[in-house]
């Protein structure tokens, strides 16, 4: 029986190997059901969050962050974050950038809802530690010709929400009477007074920043009779009016000034679309003592006496105000003086705004 004799050892070996494999499998199952097996690979430590010292918020960029026509973010990006790795934040419109000094920034999106949603997502993300951060809300804006001019840069003393309240059509009212009434229940978030000590520091550090101007802006200013509208750009301060509606015309401008006074705020000098909403988001997590609003005026909030409001809103080619490129650079020039000072003097600033 040579055939049966030659196959018997092979069958025995296969049977033995199968038994050993089954035993090993059962042992592995028992180990997984009982005490976990010890891993030979140590778990990677969690990344330490970035300690944010100053967060710069812009609302839009025209194209890329560098190398093309600059919007609100590009000059900041080129100064602080050209070598930074973007931090993608779920829920935010664009990435956050941070440098080694703790200066961070992002484009949040235009309008109250858009910008507030991005700011909330950024504040809640564990990659960033805002426990001692200062905030600079920046961008372009409009100004009444009686209070400012093209190229101006303004620090906000008060942020007032233009939208919250009751409003009705002028034809349903006594001629010349206000068409706005505040609504009860909005008192805690319809206006914010920003820290006067911080505004004072901002003005002290930036008041003499060199301002850029353009021939087109200088010529455009002469269309307005007001002395404030005709002067060269400067650094100032006052109430920033936040409204989702791009309100326009002397009547709406007068109403904005009326609301500012109704709320006990300073003169309305800037119209913008985000700051009060962003401030409310920050307030609920960190308070308002370290918030700054910085805006550059790129248009007047009304036409000159020789044009209608609609003509001013939709100008013919070559009839625009000019000065946009210079203004977005002015905003960064003014703001960097405060950012750089806070970072350089961080031991004095980390616990709060120091005495001057």
Question: What is the predicted role of each segment?
Answer:
Residues 3-20:
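Bacterial N-terminal signal peptides that target proteins for export
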Residues 27-28:
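C-terminal motif of bacterial Sec signal peptides marking the signal peptidase cleavage site
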Residues 31-356:
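Accessory terminal and edge-of-domain segments that mediate assembly/interaction
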């Amino acid at each position: 029986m040579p055939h049966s004799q030659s196959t018997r050892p092979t069958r025995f070996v296969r049977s033995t190997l199968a038994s050993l494999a089954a035993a090993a499998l059962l042992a592995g199952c028992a180990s997984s059901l009982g005490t976990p097996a010890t891993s030979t690979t140590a778990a990677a430590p969690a990344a330490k969050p970035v300690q944010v010292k100053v967060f710069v918020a812009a609302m839009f960029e025209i194209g890329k962050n560098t190398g093309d026509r600059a919007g609100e973010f590009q000059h900041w990006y080129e100064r602080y974050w050209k070598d930074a790795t973007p931090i993608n934040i779920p829920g935010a419109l664009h990435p956050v950038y941070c440098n080694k000094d703790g200066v961070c920034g992002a484009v949040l999106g235009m309008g109250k809802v858009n910008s507030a949603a991005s700011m909330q997502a950024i504040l809640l993300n564990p990659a960033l530690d805002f426990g001692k951060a200062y905030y600079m809300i920046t961008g372009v804006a409009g100004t009444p010709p009686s209070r400012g001019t093209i190229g101006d840069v303004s620090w906000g003393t008060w942020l007032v929400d233009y939208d919250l309240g009751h409003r009705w059509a002028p034809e349903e009212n006594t001629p010349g009477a206000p068409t706005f009434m505040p609504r009860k229940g909005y008192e805690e978030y319809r206006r914010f007074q920003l820290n006067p000590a911080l505004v004072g520091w901002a003005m002290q550090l930036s008041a003499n920043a060199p301002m850029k101007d353009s021939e087109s802006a200088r010529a455009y200013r002469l269309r307005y009779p007001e002395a404030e509208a005709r002067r060269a750009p400067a650094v100032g301060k006052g109430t920033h009016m936040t409204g989702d509606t791009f309100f326009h015309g002397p009547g709406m401008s007068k109403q904005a000034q009326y609301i500012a006074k109704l709320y006990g705020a300073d003169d309305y000098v800037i119209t913008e679309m985000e700051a009060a909403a962003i401030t409310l988001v920050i307030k609920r997590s960190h308070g308002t003592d370290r918030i700054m609003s910085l805006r550059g005026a790129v248009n007047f909030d009304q036409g000159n006496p020789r044009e209608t409001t609609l003509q001013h809103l939709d100008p013919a080619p070559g009839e625009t105000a000019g000065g946009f490129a210079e203004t977005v650079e002015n905003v960064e020039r003014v703001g960097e003086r405060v950012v750089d000072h806070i970072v350089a003097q961080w031991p004095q600033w980390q616990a709060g705004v120091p005495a001057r």
